[in-house]
Amino acid sequence: MKFTELTVTEFDNFVQNPSLESHYFQVKENIVTRENDGFEVVLLGIKDDNNKVIAASLFSKIPTMGSYVYYSNRGPVMDFSDLGLVDYYLKELDKYLQQHQCLYVKLDPYWLYHLYDKDIVPFEGREKNDALVNLFKSHGYEHHGFTTEYDTSSQVRWMGVLNLEGKTPETLKKTFDSQRKRNINKAINYGVKVRFLESDEFNLFLDLYRETEERAGFVSKTDDYFYNFIDTYGDKVLVPLAYIDLDEYVLKLQQELNDKENRRDQMMAKENKSDKQMKKIAELDKQIDHDQHELLNASELSKTDGPILNLASGVYFANAYEVNYFSGGSSEKYNQFMGPYMMHWFMINYCFDNGYDRYNFYGLSGDFTENSEDYGVYRFKRGFNVQIEELIGDFYKPIHKVKYWLFTTLDKLRKKLKK
């Protein structure tokens, strides 16, 4: 085996293997996004004795104190169950960094530490991956810890994932809780549609994202941050928009209303109606009243807000391994149409149609108590019967130790001065 720099083609060919647990940051398209952010990129990996790539990682080189911080965001990509391979990678990476002006290195691999069901019950027969964590420590890495909160300096360590392998949309939907099934069916009955936005329509996503940001008060990303991905990731970034055409909905409602009124009139025309028939008529009367009310509201909404209402939108990344929900927004004013549910259901079906076995709802804090900052987010994802995946976390290692000590000391002083 040999540790070496890789070409873009070598890197790309390797990470296209769907059996490898790889992240959308470890794709060739991310080279340009990192360069757009002002960082150099280097591709490092391992080749076996037949010159075949068996490990790969995309590193950003972040200029710091006359040296570089080497950061492989969600790397490296390899068979991490092969501890011998991981050991060799870490040993040879250290040698490389010693020769290439590295201040310190940060790795946050997309590697599983433990696996749980939706209720945070560990999967039977699964063990915590302490061997991997201990291997990193044996190479001088500091583990950032088994965190259970969001940290703006780190990628998420907990995720909610739908495993689609061996399932169909129908069998999967049966595993959802009653609220998820009911709301998806509501959206379908409303006639909510989903389409992918073109790059020049991305402002429609941003409008919904900014509305949600203001409503929820979360830390948002800039427009430029999103456009960096939109402009470079090509077909690896997907932006669905859930919307409703009120003209079509009104027409559908009118047809249903006409049908119910005709059935009611036919039943009323019969003589000597039984109690059972009278109950059916009473039920139809309720449905007719409801439909008339809905028809009036939809007609008024179309007049004031226009016939097309944008309900929800999201940014997704698709790589060889999975489809990953990155960020989203929705309109609170139109929440009765269940736009977010239809968007997720559409994208889940997209996975089935395109051969993906994983639909990743992505980030959770890891605190699953009712008082946690994202308990509502957890409940939403839990309702889809996700499996909870815990990743091994962040690892740091100083390479230039004297300069690293100076760097951390100055950083502590800066933080004290800010208080």
Swiss-Prot record:
Intracellular or extracellular location(s): Cytoplasm
Keyword terms, alphabetized: Acyltransferase, Antibiotic resistance, Cell shape, Cell wall biogenesis/degradation, Cytoplasm, Peptidoglycan synthesis, Transferase
Pfam families with a match to the protein in the record: FemAB
Keyword match Ligase: no
Protein origin, superkingdom: Bacteria
GO cellular component terms listed in the entry, alphabetical order: cytoplasm
A single BP term in Gene Ontology: response to antibiotic
UniProt entry tagged with the keyword Acyltransferase: yes
Chemical reaction(s) catalysed: MurNAc-L-Ala-D-isoglutaminyl-L-Lys-(N(6)-tri-Gly)-D-Ala-D-Ala-diphospho-di-trans,octa-cis-undecaprenyl-GlcNAc + 2 glycyl-tRNA(Gly) = MurNAc-L-Ala-D-isoglutaminyl-L-Lys-(N(6)-penta-Gly)-D-Ala-D-Ala-diphospho-di-trans,octa-cis-undecaprenyl-GlcNAc + 2 tRNA(Gly) + 2 H(+)
EC code(s) of this entry: 2.3.2.18
Record-level Gene Ontology MF annotations: aminoacyltransferase activity
Enzyme category, top tier: transferase
Transmembrane segments: none
Main location: cytoplasm
Assembly and interaction partners: Homodimer. Interacts with FemA.
Protein function: Catalyzes the formation of the pentaglycine interpeptide bridge, which is characteristic of the S.aureus peptidoglycan. Adds glycines 4 and 5 of the pentaglycine bridge, using glycyl-tRNA(Gly) as donor. Involved in resistance to methicillin.
Family per similarity comment: Belongs to the FemABX family.
Protein name: Aminoacyltransferase FemB
